[in-house]
Amino acid sequence: MSARDIDATVLNQTVPMRVDILEAGAPGRDAAEAFIHSHYAQAYGADIRHFLPRLMVLHAADGELLATLGFRRARNDRLFLEQYLDMPIETQLALKLGYYSRRYEMVEVGNLVTRKPGGARWLIAALTAYLKGAGYEWAVFTAVRQLRNAFARLSVELVPLGPADKSRLDAQEQILWGKYYET
C-alpha cells in the first residue's frame, strides 16, 4: 500500500458525507443523544440528561457518527446560557455591541461532540450555512476551549458576553455537569 493509498483510506474514513438535522423522535436521534451523553460522561464526568431540540449530526461515508451539535431557537424559549446572564441574551448582546439584535434572529448552540479532530469545524461550517439560509444572525453558546479553537481556525470572531458561572445553576444541575466548568 502506497502513502497515497493510506491517505485515501484515511480520508474515506474521516471525510463527512452526510449531515442530518434530527428533531425529537427522529430515527437516529437516540443514537445521537447516547453519543453526546457518553462523551460528556467520559470527558467531564457529566450526566447530560437534556438535549437541545434539534441535533445536527455528521456521518462518515460508512455511516459512522462523527460529530453532533444541538441548537435551539431563541424566539420563544429561554436559553440555557441565560442562567449565566443578568438580562435576556438580546439585551446583553446589545450592550456589548452597541446596537440591538432581535431575539428571533438568534439560536443557542450546544451538545457539541466530535469523535475525530476537525469534526467541529465541519459542523460549524454546515451550521453556519444552515442558519444563514434560515435568516439567523447570531449563534450564542457556552464555549469550552475546544469550541473556541474550532471557531478561531475558521477565522470566526467571537463576542464574549461573560463567564459561565457554575454557581448560577441549581445544586442538582451543578452535580450533573461534573467537571465541565473546569475546562
Residue map of PLM features:
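Alpha-helix boundary/capping detector
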Residues: 58, 62, 135, 157, ...
